[in-house]
Amino acid sequence: MEPLRVLELYSGVGGMHHALRESCIPAQVVAAIDVNTVANEVYKYNFPHTQLLAKTIEGITLEEFDRLSFDMILMSPPCQPFTRIGRQGDMTDSRTNSFLHILDILPRLQKLPKYILLENVKGFEVSSTRDLLIQTIENCGFQYQEFLLSPTSLGIPNSRLRYFLIAKLQSEPLPFQAPGQVLMEFPKIESVHPQKYAMDVENKIQEKNVEPNISFDGSIQCSGKDAILFKLETAEEIHRKNQQDSDLSVKMLKDFLEDDTDVNQYLLPPKSLLRYALLLDIVQPTCRRSVCFTKGYGSYIEGTGSVLQTAEDVQVENIYKSLTNLSQEEQITKLLILKLRYFTPKEIANLLGFPPEFGFPEKITVKQRYRLLGNSLNVHVVAKLIKILYE
């Protein structure tokens, strides 16, 4: 059987390509396209024999797309126009132009691809761009299903909720198709149990607008589930984290850590410890959770990813509760006892499902590695969706 000809758009460091390999379907990437020169260096390093086009997607003509004669499109368009933190410019954001170009080209191709897989951030599912995508693929004759999935559903201790769409060129619906619904779990094709739907359920974590350099005098007063216990976490948040840590279907973080790391270069500097102590999401190697790593990890603290406590037999709570009424120097001394460090780029790649052989050229800096991985996707989640789509 001829391998599928796959077009990888917005290829980044090659997450989709790794997922395609992991899925074990007969396929070959005929071209990968990305305009990011640093990401392309990493892609070439890992896939030296794949045709990589370093150009804008808008610059590719219908004739050039036709010449590639692809059976499958894997793509992860820019997410900034749809992020919760961004301006949510949607179609008016210039970064959406390349994707609108794809939607314009798709119906005019000499040969339509049989399969499409798209990944984006949560928020894409309520965008006008998504509506245009659905309209376009429906008009072309695709059957499709949308998902909101996190790696935790595959036993990976990292929350990274993302939007996915899989589409197949055929007249009969997909066996698990739920029209108008966004599925919140992988389809159980053989099961008769109803799927979990997103419906109107918005698990919005309330954004905390917190000023850095908060004093440790315990003066914040709340009650019940909103009570601030220690750090800036409510009882409800701590309960949620404890629940995640007791979910035995999820692996421990220690399974994803490097053994021979030079920890010192990844330790949080004293200044950051003092300034952001109350905002850190601290995990231990035995935890079964970590928050989403973003492209700002290693440069910014708040909301960019978890940090690892490497000191054993030290209770975070005890350290934090002992900070009251101490001078800044004494607070730093206490916080340093925890030996908090950033996850290394390799460890984040492990959590994202990249294979052990995945690597970076030496000239790519640690900051660049964090940035590239923060923009990437979870390989295992995509691999499973490719398998489901191909079946």
UniProtKB/Swiss-Prot annotation:
E.C. designation(s): 2.1.1.204
Gene Ontology terms: biological process: tRNA methylation; tRNA modification; tRNA stabilization
Residues annotated for S-adenosyl-L-methionine binding in this entry: V13, G14, G15, D34, I57, E58, S76, S376
CDD domains in UniProt: Cyt_C5_DNA_methylase
Top-level taxon in the UniProt lineage: Eukaryota
Tissues and organs where the protein is expressed, per its UniProt entry: Ubiquitous. Higher expression in testis, ovary and thymus and at much lower levels in spleen, prostate, colon, small intestine, and peripheral blood leukocytes.
EC class: transferase
Family annotation (InterPro entries): C5-MTase, C5_MeTfrase, C5_meth_CS, SAM-dependent_MTases_sf
Residues at the catalytic site: C79
Pfam families: DNA_methylase
Family statement drawn from the similarity comment of this UniProt entry: Belongs to the class I-like SAM-binding methyltransferase superfamily. C5-methyltransferase family.
Annotated protein name in UniProt: tRNA (cytosine(38)-C(5))-methyltransferase
Organism for this UniProt entry: Homo sapiens (Human)
Lineage of producing organism: Eukaryota, Metazoa, Chordata, Craniata, Vertebrata
